[in-house]
Amino acid sequence: MAKGKRTFQPNNRRRARVHGFRLRMRTRAGRAIVSARRRKGRESLTA
């Protein structure tokens, strides 16, 4: 039986556009995410 294709096709530009820093800073909720990750001491804040 044939399975479908793999669903994760890595693409750095799309990754940044969907989960990137500029996108997070656009909305109040996104800024809250970044500040929470800063507070927690995350090595990486966004994709």
Swiss-Prot record:
Disulfide bonds: none annotated. Keywords: Ribonucleoprotein, Ribosomal protein. It comes from the Bacteria. One of its GO terms (cellular component) is ribonucleoprotein complex. PROSITE patterns: RIBOSOMAL_L34. The keyword Ribonucleoprotein applies. NCBIfam families: rpmH_bact (TIGR01030). Belongs to the bacterial ribosomal protein bL34 family. This is Large ribosomal subunit protein bL34. It comes from Rhodococcus opacus (strain B4). The lineage of its organism: Bacteria, Bacillati, Actinomycetota, Actinomycetes, Mycobacteriales. The gene is rpmH.
